Each structure stands twice: as C-alpha cells, then as structure tokens.
Curated annotation (Swiss-Prot):
Enzyme class: lyase
Its EC number(s): 4.2.1.9
Enzymatic reactions: (2R)-2,3-dihydroxy-3-methylbutanoate = 3-methyl-2-oxobutanoate + H2O; (2R,3R)-2,3-dihydroxy-3-methylpentanoate = (S)-3-methyl-2-oxopentanoate + H2O
Lineage: Bacteria, Pseudomonadati, Pseudomonadota, Gammaproteobacteria, Enterobacterales
Any one GO molecular-function label of the UniProt entry: magnesium ion binding
SS bond partners: none
Alphabetically ordered keywords of this record: 2Fe-2S, Amino-acid biosynthesis, Branched-chain amino acid biosynthesis, Iron, Iron-sulfur, Lyase, Magnesium, Metal-binding
Gene name of the record: ilvD
Name under which the protein is recorded: Dihydroxy-acid dehydratase
Organism name: Escherichia coli (strain K12)
Amino acid sequence: MPKYRSATTTHGRNMAGARALWRATGMTDADFGKPIIAVVNSFTQFVPGHVHLRDLGKLVAEQIEAAGGVAKEFNTIAVDDGIAMGHGGMLYSLPSRELIADSVEYMVNAHCADAMVCISNCDKITPGMLMASLRLNIPVIFVSGGPMEAGKTKLSDQIIKLDLVDAMIQGADPKVSDSQSDQVERSACPTCGSCSGMFTANSMNCLTEALGLSQPGNGSLLATHADRKQLFLNAGKRIVELTKRYYEQNDESALPRNIASKAAFENAMTLDIAMGGSTNTVLHLLAAAQEAEIDFTMSDIDKLSRKVPQLCKVAPSTQKYHMEDVHRAGGVIGILGELDRAGLLNRDVKNVLGLTLPQTLEQYDVMLTQDDAVKNMFRAGPAGIRTTQAFSQDCRWDTLDDDRANGCIRSLEHAYSKDGGLAVLYGNFAENGCIVKTAGVDDSILKFTGPAKVYESQDDAVEAILGGKVVAGDVVVIRYEGPKGGPGMQEMLYPTSFLKSMGLGKACALITDGRFSGGTSGLSIGHVSPEAASGGSIGLIEDGDLIAIDIPNRGIQLQVSDAELAARREAQDARGDKAWTPKNRERQVSFALRAYASLATSADKGAVRDKSKLGG
C-alpha cells in the first residue's frame, strides 16, 4: 500500500520545522494526514487564453477541501505564441514547454504533493503540464480554460467569422484597405480563451480528452460559458477520489500512465488526424509518450495517418466552423463516437471519471445519449460580447448539429476526405520524416514540384516573400530553424500567412525544419528531421534544386543525385566549427537558449532533451 507522499513533510517529530511552515500557510492539525493536492494554475495577464484563470484555481481548491483534501496552488509561466510570433520572442516558445514541465516537477517533488489538478490552456502550457504529469505519475486531472468565441464582423454586407489568422493575413495584404484591416483586427479575438480555431491550444485540449486525462467537453466548451464552471467543480471533487483510490486502496488505475496508455495515445493521434489538428500536436504527443515511457513513434503516427479519414474540418482549414461549432456537434466525444463506429479506436481504455470508452460514448455522445443534461451542455454557444471573464454568459444554440452528412462532424460515409488531416512524409532530405497538415492543403497541390528558394532564417524568408522574390511555383525552404538550429524551433505562421497575402497560398510550397502554428494552412511541410543543425540533408539543398512533393504517396524528394549530395556533405563537413550552421545570419542567442539547444533533439523525437548527453 503506497503511503501519501505528503507524509514525508507532515509526520514525525523530525518534520517539526516543515509542519511549522505548513501551519504558516493556513494548515492545522486536522490537515496533517489529508492528501495535499497541487492546483497547478497558469494565470497570466499576457495571454488571452489564461487571463481569466486567476479565480479558477480557488474554485478548484474549494472543492478539493470540501472533499477532504488540502489544496495548494502555484502558477507556471505561459507564453503567448501569437504575441511572440514573427520576432525573436518565438525562440522562447517551445523551450518554455520544458521549463513548464520541469517547474511542475520541481514544485510537486520539492513539497511532496500527492496529486494535481492542471489548469492549462494555450500552446505549450498543456503539453508541458502533460509531460510533467506523466513524468511524476501521480493522480491528475486536466481542466483547461476553454476556447475563445469566434470573432464576427460584417464585410461586403455579409457577416463572416474571424480569428487571429485573418487579422495577420489581412494586415499584410496590400490590397486590403487600412479601415478593413483595422475592422478585422478589432473583431478577430473578442473574448478570453484559446484562439477559436483548431489551432495548437485547442488541439491539445481536445487530445487530453482522448487520452482520458480530462472530462468530456474540456476541449470544446467555450471559456465564456457558464457551463464550463462545472468542469472545474467536478475536477476538484474527482481528484480527491482518485487520490484516495491510489493511496488508500492501492488502485494503480488512478495513475496517469495507466489511463494514458499506449492504446490511449493511439486513440488521441487517431482523433488528431480525424479532426485535422495542429502539426504541433505530433511534437507534443511524441514528447509526452517519452515521459510516460511508451514506445510511440513517428512510425506509429504514419501507420495511423494512412487509415484514418478526416471527419471534422475547422478553421484554419475552413472559415465555416470554429470550436464553438465543434462543441455544438458533440465536441471531442462526437468525433470519437464516429471513429468508434468506424472501428478505428481502441475500446479498452478508461478516463479520469473511471468510464470505459463505450461507457463514455453511451453517456456523452450526442448521437447516442438519452441524457437531456448532456445534450443541453453541448448546446452551449457564444454570446458575441467582448469579455475577459470566465463563465460570463449562458447562451445556447436552438438545436444541436447532429447532421453527420453535411455538418461540422461527419460520419465515415460522409468524411471530408478518406485521407486524414495529418500525414508523415519521408524522402532523401527527410529520412526521419516530416509533417504536413493535409486538412489545410488544397487538392490541386497535393502533388507539387518546383525549384527551391533557400533561406537560413524566417526573417530572410519573410523579407523575400513580401519583396516579391518568391513567385508562383517556388518551394520556399527555411532551415536552421529546428530545435537546435534556431534554437527553439520557431513557428512559421508569418511566412505562410504572407504567402497568402501575396496571392501565393495555392501556388507555392514551404518546407522547414522549424514548425508551424496551428493556424497554418497551405502546402506547409515542417519538422523535417534530422534538422540542418544536426547534419540533416535539408542543409544540403541549394537554390534552384527541384523538390518533388507527393502527399498521396507520402513522399518528398530532392531531385539531386546521391553523388552530388555526398559531395555537398563533404564540403559542409569541411567547414569545421562552422559546419552545419547558417552562413549569413546574425542572431543574438541568450545563454538560456544555448543551454536548451545543447540538449535538444530533432522533431521526430518530440524535440525533447537528449538524455544520453546526461548519462540517463
């Protein structure tokens, strides 16, 4: 029988000093012996996805204490990728994932907490907390801040839906007037919450549902809606039950590694492919699997991508649907229900509520449930009122979207595409693979061949695109932007957005060892592995080389002979200390980022730290 970890600091005469300090935080004799549960919050005024979280930790804490636990809250950092985008700030985004994971480990282990409720939301915060949870392997429940409402504005006498990406594209489009650009900017992000499309934040919050670590509705129920409060109340109560099950009943099924099993990871990736999630999710699932000591690799993702269809299409792949529409159609559970009926899921998995997949679907799938309260929850909709307050409105759709032939979520028979929303490509400069969000690629360019235009920084590529140096038919190659080479593996949302602004969204391809925002669409291929800074063959591409992309056959090929590539590699190696570094790039890299780069692996490994360099 495991004993409470917290007993280390609360029991025994030799812990008098620790108890004295606990008393100074408000604990009493009656609390020593209760489970200490960390409320891992991520409130910050820098990020719209986290600006409303200040009081939500207290909400969870009250429920923990009412259920017989002791709640202790702390915050992690949170970087807003949209605000950090397009300048040196983006170098810090992916490395912040490791800092978040480490900081959670540090706080929880230093104070011997017994369990956690993780209040996350945006791009690197959910993955960082997920990595920490699987590393620590103590009871945990995730409850995120929820999605932002979609923006809406009237253009050309028509009401259209908007998001962050629209503001970026129109702001750079010389054909768009200043007044229209300003109108879109002011309308694109109307409320608190994670940006309203199927971008990285919302993708990851959906995947925590599929992994079983959060409650139904977590990924899609709007941040502003009053119904979302119940998820926080439930999390506080339920975590005490899970904690007591493990420590008092020796029930290891309450632990995250037993909930987020390999079968659950396969289900999460299947969901990701079916909903056309962000390519960043691949990076984060690979990293989380390593923390869980699960053998889940690019090969597994490749196999799944070849058999899973696309059943949901959401911004940025279409402007018709945003997360509020996914929720109306049944949310994550609605998509999982269609995947289950197609025989594409592992059914022998459980979630933090203790429900198996069939039980979860029976209770929460809008196509199956007889529970009017569940149906009412999925009718929770937007209010269209600018606010930074959680739970500030209670508007509802008149009806659910249960049209599986033409609605937001489709059945297998009416899939948007027989091929899923993500694909792994392999070739002679991506020997370990690269990722493309096929959900955002127009059918006309699924096969594409063109000459390379090579840039050794995102900044140079942006300057060339906006300066008219990139033309229709080109393949833009941005290298030395991987985890090690950047360092930090910057997102390339500005280059892809500016290609659209210049009318080249369906006329060019972009390939990088960096990564893309969840807001990216178009023929954008990232995570090329090995990266250039690690001796990857992407570092051998020269201007004018022909590159052939074949998404249907999962191929990507540099049309240069093996002999020529060998000669180029020899010349690169001969540069000595300058080998596999950019030739003409001035970039200030801090000590913190250099430390990150010294241990970073390529994207096919999840861009995690290379444990072999630490002797582990």
